[in-house]
Curated annotation (Swiss-Prot):
Signal peptide: none
Role description: One of the primary rRNA binding proteins, it binds directly to 16S rRNA where it nucleates assembly of the body of the 30S subunit.
S4 RNA-binding domain mapped to chain residues: 93-156
Family to which this protein belongs: Belongs to the universal ribosomal protein uS4 family.
HAMAP family in UniProt: Ribosomal_uS4_B
Name of the protein in its database record: Small ribosomal subunit protein uS4
GO cellular component: small ribosomal subunit
SMART domains referenced in this protein's UniProt entry, alphabetically: Ribosomal_S4, S4
Subunit structure, interactors included: Part of the 30S ribosomal subunit. Contacts protein S5. The interaction surface between S4 and S5 is involved in control of translational fidelity.
Biological classification of the source: Bacteria, Bacillati, Bacillota, Bacilli, Lactobacillales
Length: 202
């Protein structure tokens, strides 16, 4: 399955989440496209709830189905911790997500484009693979020739706050993962136990 590249607001309304992180998609019409209010929503089966939760998280991080399921398998091989939490931590460690968390991009989609176009470095070396897994202490920065990009400066200026598991130097436009995130620091509106149940039934 290919990565969805269409209008994010339609998916946001259908799944009941803000993929952009701004919440604007849900502000005016907090119901799915085609519905005319919450009364038209049909009761969802247990499987439907599991599937929707999986789709919410997959769309939130912008992964293909294959990327998403492969990462879940990897999380299941980690002996310590809960599978759902381990899965979400692996998602967080993706380079495109870390660029977003550091505030170098306003959305994960924008962060993925910055990585794809070669604007991002890891420990001083250009890395253009969004799925690159960031290790604790690695320095994520912006290429020297890309530091004047308006899209990056506007993103940094718009940051209200950053997660406690990252640190960022605004002058150098670089930061790092200082520790692995705790579950309560990640997406609160995601029930990862439903995702675990979904994949366990396959």
């Amino acid at each position: 399955m290919s990565r969805y590249t269409g209008p994010s607001w339609k998916v946001s309304r259908r799944l009941g989440i803000s993929l952009t992180g701004t919440g604007k998609e849900l502000a005016r019409r907090p119901y799915a496209p085609g519905d005319h209010g919450q009364n038209n929503r049909r009761k969802i089966s247990e499987y439907g709830m599991q599937l929707r939760e999986k789709q919410k998280l997959r769309m939130m991080y912008g992964l293909t189905e294959r990327q998403f399921s492969n990462l879940f398998v990897r999380a299941g091989k980690i002996r310590e911790g809960l599978p759902g939490t381990n899965f979400m931590v692996l998602l967080e460690r993706r380079l495109d997500n870390m660029v977003y968390r550091l505030g170098l991009a306003t959305t994960r989609r924008q962060a993925r484009q910055l990585v794809n176009h070669g604007h991002i470095t890891v420990d001083g070396k250009r890395v253009d693979i969004p799925s690159y897994e960031v290790e604790i202490g690695q320095v994520i920065g912006v290429r020297e020739k890309s530091k004047d990009l308006k899209i990056i400066s506007e993103a940094v200026e718009a940051v209200v706050g950053r997660p406690q598991f990252v640190q960022f130097d605004a002058d150098k436009l670089e930061g790092s993962l200082v520790r692995l995130p705790q579950r309560d620091e990640l997406e609160a509106d995601i029930d990862d136990s439903l995702i675990v149940e979904y994949y366990n039934k396959l």
